[in-house]
Amino acid sequence: MKNLLSVVKISVPDQVYLKDPETSDLGKRIIENSILLIDELGFDSFTFKKLGTKIGSNESSIYRYFESKHKLLLYLSSWYWAWLEYQLVVETFSLSNPKEKLNKAVAIVTNTVAFDRNFSHINEVVLYKIIVNESSKSFLTKEVDSENKEGYFEIYKRLITRLSDMMLAINPNFAFSLSLASTVLEGGLHQHFLQAHFPSITNCKNDKTPTDFFLDLIENALK
């Protein structure tokens, strides 16, 4: 898998950027440092002016890649979901047992993230913190319906569909596979958020993980 990942380019919908940041050193520095700066300041306090100062480039140069910080957040979110989807596909491809395949997939999408050396300009551990804390801001907007029609969220929705299909492979009569799959994907983030900020209102602590919770939930739902 490591050798395969090293030659793979994670694809992001081209609607979210003006120029592909992966095509230049400046673009990669924009992505690398935007992740670090959003984590440091929070998305609301993050600006292209501050990012320009951090990377030693004019603010206007960043606007050649992204028309707004909203589009940048959409890019980061899409990159994360595409990276996660690729891991899911590779790790489950050879598994023939439907339950084993689903359990593996759930573990991948609900576990904490480890650093991936295949993408040196992207710190996936820090990016994951942004996804947990900030990614909902990419779609909780007035423009969500139009952006959805334009394909901004295709990777996110495709990942949910993959989980749903795995559930139906176990129980074809289960009527709520998409609802459960989307709950797993978003709920995994939410449980990690609760662990970090509101530990008194989650059972996912000590030796119990969000993965344990969702595996138990799915097993009971698919009976």
Name these PLM-found stretches.
Residues 100, 127-169:
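Amphipathic alpha-helical packing segments from all-alpha helical-bundle domains
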Residues 32, 36, 72-93, 104, ...:
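Alpha-helical structural segments
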Residues 44-71:
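Helix-turn-helix
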Residues 1-11, 157, 161-172, 182-223:
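C-terminal peripheral helix-coil segments that are non-catalytic and often amphipathic
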Residues 91-125:
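Hydrophobic alpha-helical connector segments
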